[in-house]
């Protein structure tokens, strides 16, 4: 939404659960797992590696998207994240994001 309250566009990203489910359903050996935040970015086993990739990877993706959006807009953007699982990844983002 711009300074004149007009909707100018946005982006839709795959959710955490969709990403995690896709890994297990579209590969032969990766298990279906719960979406718990790993303690470290570098996983030591398959489950922690999957969780790290999804959770920390999505946080980095969001930060990167915001940088690109602000570059395109020529200034700062206010971001509101939606979805029930957003609270799992937002604390790991380096950018400030509102959760509605």
Model-derived features: positions:
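Short hydrophobic/aromatic-enriched beta-strand-loop microsegments
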Residues: 7-12, 96-100
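A short acidic/small-residue loop/turn micro-motif
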Residues: 14-16
């Amino acid at each position: 939404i711009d300074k004149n309250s007009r909707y100018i566009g946005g982006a839709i990203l795959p959710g955490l659960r969709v990403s995690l489910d896709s890994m297990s359903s579209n590969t032969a050996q990766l298990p279906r797992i719960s979406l718990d935040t790993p303690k470290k970015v570098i996983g030591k086993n398959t489950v922690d590696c999957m969780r790290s990739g999804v959770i920390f990877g999505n946080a980095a993706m969001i930060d990167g998207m915001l940088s690109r959006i602000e570059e395109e807009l020529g200034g700062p953007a206010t971001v509101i994240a939606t979805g029930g699982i957003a609270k799992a990844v937002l604390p790991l983002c380096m950018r400030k994001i509102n959760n509605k």
